Amino acid sequence: MKIVLQKVSQASVVVDSKVISSIKHGYMLLVGISIDDSMAEIDKLSKKVLSLRIFEDESRNLWKKNIKEANGEILSVSQFTLMAKTKKGTKPDFHLAQKGHIAKELYEEFLKLLRSDLGEEKVKDGEFGAMMSCSLTNEGPVTIILDSDQ
């Protein structure tokens, strides 16, 4: 499982020319699920996302607060392309990406774990399997790659 986590001041997802989700202060997550992933990886990385101290405190000291302490929101988007291998040739190879129906189940469990900690209204997502346009304003910029294998 791989996650690209970006600290944002705003983020949104558009499907078919309509904004389907948006947040203000928080994280934009791009989430890729591999053929080797199970609930163990989902649990591990959901805890990591929730516990990372990326936000500043009231005195503007960096790396002091996690997403909940900062009263932030999460916008999560499933993205199988994070599993791409590009070692050979010029066409990305996605054979390490989980099959859609299994990835969807695991992704929904990931969202459920985030929502159980932050609250239903604080965790939004895109549309699984859809072509989406994502926009964000990255703060910092802070961009962190989480990998369940590392």
Curated annotation (Swiss-Prot):
Coiled-coil region(s): none
Keywords on record: Cytoplasm, Hydrolase, RNA-binding, tRNA-binding
GO terms for cellular component: cytoplasm
Similarity-based family: Belongs to the DTD family.
Intervals of motif Gly-cisPro motif, important for rejection of L-amino acids: 140-141
Phenotype seen when the gene is deleted: 10-fold decrease in D-tyrosyl-tRNA(Tyr) deacylase activity, growth becomes more sensitive to D-tyrosine and is inhibited at 0.1 mM D-Tyr. Growth is also inhibited in the presence of 0.3 mM D-leucine; wild-type cells grow well in up to 0.3 mM D-Tyr and 10 mM D-Leu. No growth differences observed in the presence of the other D-amino acids.
Subcellular location: Cytoplasm
The EC number(s) this enzyme carries: 3.1.1.96
Subunit description: Homodimer.
GO BP of this protein: D-leucine catabolic process; D-tyrosine catabolic process; tRNA metabolic process
Highest taxon, organism lineage: Eukaryota
Molecular-function GO terms, alphabetical: D-leucyl-tRNA(Leu) deacylase activity; D-tyrosyl-tRNA(Tyr) deacylase activity; tRNA binding
Pfam family, one: Tyr_Deacylase
Domain notes per entry: A Gly-cisPro motif from one monomer fits into the active site of the other monomer to allow specific chiral rejection of L-amino acids.
Catalytic activity: glycyl-tRNA(Ala) + H2O = tRNA(Ala) + glycine + H(+); a D-aminoacyl-tRNA + H2O = a tRNA + a D-alpha-amino acid + H(+); D-tyrosyl-tRNA(Tyr) + H2O = D-tyrosine + tRNA(Tyr)
Entry protein name: D-aminoacyl-tRNA deacylase
Alphabetical list of PANTHER family matching this protein: D-AMINOACYL-TRNA DEACYLASE 1 (PTHR10472:SF5), D-TYROSYL-TRNA TYR DEACYLASE (PTHR10472)
Role of this protein: An aminoacyl-tRNA editing enzyme that deacylates mischarged D-aminoacyl-tRNAs. Hydrolyzes D-tyrosyl-tRNA(Tyr) into D-tyrosine and free tRNA(Tyr). May also deacylate mischarged D-leucyl-tRNA(Leu). Also deacylates mischarged glycyl-tRNA(Ala), protecting cells against glycine mischarging by AlaRS. Acts via tRNA-based rather than protein-based catalysis; rejects L-amino acids rather than detecting D-amino acids in the active site.
Organism from which the protein derives: Saccharomyces cerevisiae (strain ATCC 204508 / S288c) (Baker's yeast)
Alphabetized SUPFAM superfamilies for the sequence: DTD-like
NCBIfam families, alphabetized: D-aminoacyl-tRNA deacylase (TIGR00256)
Hydrolase as UniProt keyword: yes
